[in-house]
Amino acid sequence: MATTYATGKRKTAVAKVWVKSGSGKIIVNGMDLNTWLGGHEAIKLKVVQPLLVTKQETSMDIKATTLGGGYSAQAEALRHGISRALASMDADFRALLKPKGLLTRDSRTVERKKYGRRKARRSPQFSKR
């Protein structure tokens, strides 16, 4: 089976993902997934969720590069990229991933700061007198 490429995004993080048949190795930014995450098990479960849903955790090799955002946003971008790559490999995978919401881009981003305000919504302190 050929290598499939997809991109995933979350906030300002972007993940470029290459998926191919293999033994279940996941390499992110040249490091093993566990090394890259530094032992964050909750985030690891988030990343491998598309593989668990499609039951491909031991039959797909994944190579990915991530940039922008923090660890959590990069992990969710990686999950989105893996989901999109799997969906383009097999239509049956798409039918499994779509109901779980794994193919949907989470469009929530930081609200911009407005002038006359301290933050996006925080106003300066009001003094009555």
UniProtKB/Swiss-Prot annotation:
Q: Where is this region: Disordered?
A: 107-129
Give the UniProt record's GO annotations in the biological process aspect: translation
List the GO terms this entry assigns under cellular component, sorted alphabetically. Answer: cytosolic small ribosomal subunit
Pfam families assigned to the protein according to its UniProt record, in alphabetical order: Ribosomal_S9
Quote the InterPro entries the UniProt record gives.
Ribosomal_Su5_D2-typ_SF, Ribosomal_uS9, Ribosomal_uS9_bac/plastid, Ribosomal_uS9_CS, Ribsml_uS5_D2-typ_fold_subgr
Q: Does Protein transport count among this protein's keywords? A: no
User: Which keywords does UniProt give here?
Assistant: Ribonucleoprotein, Ribosomal protein
Q: Which GO terms describe its molecular function?
A: RNA binding; structural constituent of ribosome
- Quote the biased-composition stretches of kind Basic residues, using this chain's numbering: 114-129
**From which domain of life does this come?**
Bacteria
Cleavable signal peptide:
none
Q: Which family does it belong to?
A: Belongs to the universal ribosomal protein uS9 family.
Q: What is this protein called?
A: Small ribosomal subunit protein uS9
Native source organism of the sequence: Campylobacter lari (strain RM2100 / D67 / ATCC BAA-1060)
